[in-house]
Regions:
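Radical SAM [4Fe-4S] cluster-binding motif and immediate context
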Residues: 196-364, 371, 386
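Flexible glycine/acidic-rich beta-alpha junction loops that bind and position SAM and/or redox cofactors
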Residues: 20, 78-86, 148-153, 279, ...
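Radical SAM enzyme core and accessory elements
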Residues: 1-13, 37-38, 42, 64-70, ...
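Acidic, low-complexity intrinsically disordered segments
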Residues: 1-256, 261-262
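Short, electropositive alpha-helical surface patch
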Residues: 156, 163, 282-289, 376-395
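A structural motif corresponding to the C-terminal end of an alpha-helix
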Residues: 39-41, 129-140, 261-262, 291, ...
Length: 514
């Protein structure tokens, strides 16, 4: 036995962020950490794995791992999409780091040519990082969680954890003698026990080094009332609002705590559809009235709900929403009906004009449009694009996305949409040779016949939009990141401070060297 200075955390979770420089901390790691702390476990979250080199990694482990460290977990959610066993396939990133972005970030943070943790995982070279964990405690388990575990099946983990983790991770820690399968997925929806979702909130510690201008993630509801054909979110079709929406008290506590401790006022609401319930919006509006500050929110909404519930437009403004992303998807009547958004396109457009009158310059409206849906031809898309480009169009930013179909048989732990489970029914074909994300063909009454074609159209339209940027007085939330109080370079601003605090807080622990 030897004496070692360490914090001896029960768990360590390694996390990444969305694209730099306008990053958002991965929320899931901090949600799980909060849940475990509430149940008596000590947890360290390490953010910014895209900027973490292996030398700093070992320095952190030296003062963090001890005899009581049960697991070191890695979140795959913001790692790049890749082939299951390597980086052979160029795959649309959908907001996560693509391979070039990973390398650019490494260069920007000046890691002297060393692979960062995220890049090592992407290249299938994570073993040295895991070996260092085992060096300091051979009994510590390695877990891989997050939404992309199927894309990182070669990661040297003892266990892979699928889906929402609150129930599964607590079971894992509380049942140490249980023989756990490599894949832990016995409650991937975190619904088998009443663990307190509606009373829950996510909190942060001094080690997280939160800055006041950060955009934080806020869960108000977990689930959605609707079941759109293309939607792969796991908890759709929820009807009982009392079971999937947080209580006012917990929402108030989280917002006030983050403001009091860190000065946080800006949030991205993670709800699948924020305005799926007017009752929910009224509840949030009442919470906001009680706060000693005015929060600002970005969220995803359905515009057809504002057609049937026009009072929602004012409610969203009262809450403090300053940016909405509207899932328009298509204006083609047959296509819209197939995917579950069959309201007449003119009614949806009029609703967008309606909210513009109420919101004025205070809310920026962004929209998403999917290329490759059933029945919609290129000419139909061009007609919609022409409307988006009109000077008085109430949609300030439109983003085109190719339809991506992920075959369930290839990625069994990824939540799948109805379209992905029965794509043949809708005229899509995926051959064995092309059985990876996105490689479909189709033969229907449209002239868009493949993913490759839909991707090319989306890229061309997005480029066209960039060449004609809409300059307006409408709220633009994008300050240049140099003007914001956020961590801009984790290698100089985050990791040195983290190490200093960990070394200062370390206590002498007896460690068995055998």
């Amino acid at each position: 036995m030897i004496n070692v200075p360490t914090n001896n955390f029960n768990a360590i979770i390694v996390n990444d962020t969305s694209d730099y420089p306008e990053w958002v901390r991965g929320h899931g790691a901090h949600r799980i950490a909060t849940h475990l702390r509430e149940n008596g476990y000590s947890v360290l979250v390490i953010d910014f794995s895209s900027a973490l080199n292996i030398h700093i990694w070992e320095e952190i482990l030296k003062v963090s791992i001890g005899p009581d460290t049960r697991f070191v977990g890695f979140s795959s959610s913001w790692w790049p999409y890749r082939n299951k066993t390597g980086n052979q396939l160029p795959i649309p990133s959908n907001g996560s780091h693509d391979p070039e972005e990973v390398r650019r970030v490494r260069a920007m943070f000046g890691n002297n040519g060393q692979n960062t943790l995220t890049e090592s995982a992407f290249l299938g070279k994570a073993k040295p990082w895991v070996d260092l964990v085992k060096k300091y405690n051979s009994k510590t388990k390695i877990l891989l969680g997050g939404v992309k575990i199927d894309w990182y099946a070669d990661f040297p983990a003892d266990h892979f954890m699928a889906g929402y983790g609150e129930v599964q991770i607590l079971d894992f820690l509380q049942q140490p003698k249980r023989i756990w399968n490599t894949l832990i997925n016995h409650d991937s929806s975190a619904e088998s026990k009443n663990w307190g979702w509606v009373e829950s909130f996510t909190s942060y510690t001094k080690y997280d080094q939160i800055r006041s201008d950060e955009l934080m993630t806020l869960e108000i509801a977990r689930g959605c009332r609707f079941s759109c054909l293309f939607c792969a979110w796991p908890l759709i079709g929820k009807k009982d609002i009392a079971k999937y929406v947080k209580e006012s008290k917990s929402l108030y506590t989280e917002l006030l705590d983050n403001y009091t401790k860190w000065g946080i006022t800006d949030y991205w609401i993670a709800d699948d559809t924020f305005n799926d319930s007017t009752e929910k919006l009224k509840c949030v509006a009442e919470v906001v009235k009680l706060l000693p500050f005015k929060p600002k929110f970005r969220c995803y909404i359905r515009i057809d709900l504002i057609v049937t519930h026009p009072e929602q437009a004012q409610l969203l403004l009262d809450i403090g929403v300053n940016t909405v992303f509207v899932g328009i998807e298509t204006f083609h009547p047959k296509s819209a009906k197939v995917i579950g958004k069959g309201m007449d396109s003119e009614k949806r457009k009029q609703a967008l004009y309606h909210v513009q009158k109420i919101w004025g310059d205070q809310v920026r409206v962004q929209g998403g449009y999917i290329i490759g849906l059933p029945h919609e031809a290129y000419a139909d898309i061009c007609k919609s694009h022409a409307w988006f480009m009109q000077p008085d169009c109430p949609v300030h930013d439109i983003f085109y996305f190719p339809l991506i179909i992920t075959p369930p048989e290839l990625y069994p732990n990824k939540p799948t949409s109805e379209l992905e489970r029965s794509y043949e029914k809708y005229g899509y074909v995926i051959t064995k040779e092309n059985m990876h994300i996105g490689q479909w063909t189709k033969n229907d009454d449209s002239d868009i016949t493949s993913f490759i074609q839909s991707n090319a159209i989306a890229k061309a339209l997005n480029t066209n939009i960039q060449n004609k940027i809409k300059l307006s007085t409408v709220n633009n939330f994008r300050r240049h990141y140099s003007e914001t109080n956020i961590i801009k370079d984790p290698t100089t601003e985050y990791f040195p401070n983290l190490l200093t605090m960990l070394k200062r807080d370390a206590e002498i622990v007896k460690v068995n060297t055998v």
